């Protein structure tokens, strides 16, 4: 598979084995999106030039066979109480630009519109080149974080693992604590310009500023 082209061969996502490597997952999910979405729609060539239009996702996966956590894209994990993150490298700078605009008096909706060209530019120059995302094109492997659970000094037999999306501003050991921290963030800093800096804040009609997924288990 080329470093720049959508895969042209059929691939069965169901063939991924229990002892698969993180690279196997990355290749498998990329092939699946290309085969099942882009190729049937005839959009692969256009999306090659327009990464801002691609289907995009992140994933954080626990491999029981390999005792590893794979962080593919913008996600987070607590392993033995230690926080691991894998954010986009450009987001902090753009988020701070949005904060400055709002503090100067600009309405949050307009501040978001002002930074959107910067977000698109970052996608054009960096998506699966300087940071990792699942988008149906070859995944930037250097941006995939693999955490060995078995060799981690902080993990014991009774240690829990938490995997979550980036929708939790402050990831905690339990769902209740994480939801409480998020509720406090929304109540005290709904536009994410102070205690937590982000490229977007709470939009009217929404319950939070981003999607959220949370799972906690014993390895």
For the regions a language model picked out, list residue spans one by one.
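PP2C/PPM-type serine/threonine phosphatase catalytic domain
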Residues: 1-219
């Amino acid at each position: 598979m080329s470093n720049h082209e959508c895969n042209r061969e059929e691939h069965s996502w169901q063939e991924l084995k229990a002892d698969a490597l993180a690279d196997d997952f990355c290749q498998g999910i990329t092939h699946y999106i290309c085969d099942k979405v882009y190729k049937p729609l005839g959009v692969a060539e256009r999306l090659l030039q327009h990464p801002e239009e691609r289907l995009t996702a992140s994933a954080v996966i626990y491999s029981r066979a390999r005792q590893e956590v794979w962080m593919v894209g913008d996600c987070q994990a607590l392993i033995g109480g230690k926080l691991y993150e894998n954010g986009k490298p450009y987001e902090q700078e753009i988020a701070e630009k949005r904060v400055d605009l709002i503090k100067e008096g600009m309405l949050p909706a307009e501040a978001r519109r002002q930074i959107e060209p910067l977000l698109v530019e970052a996608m054009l120059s960096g998506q699966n080149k300087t940071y990792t995302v699942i988008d149906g094109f070859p995944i930037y492997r250097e941006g995939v974080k693999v955490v060995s659970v078995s060799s981690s000094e902080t993990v014991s037999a009774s240690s829990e693992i938490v995997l979550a999306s980036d929708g939790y501003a402050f990831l905690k050991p339990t769902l209740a604590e994480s939801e409480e921290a998020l509720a406090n963030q929304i109540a005290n800093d709904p536009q994410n310009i102070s205690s937590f800096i982000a490229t977007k804040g709470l939009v009217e009609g929404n319950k939070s500023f981003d999607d959220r997924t949370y799972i906690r288990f014993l390895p």
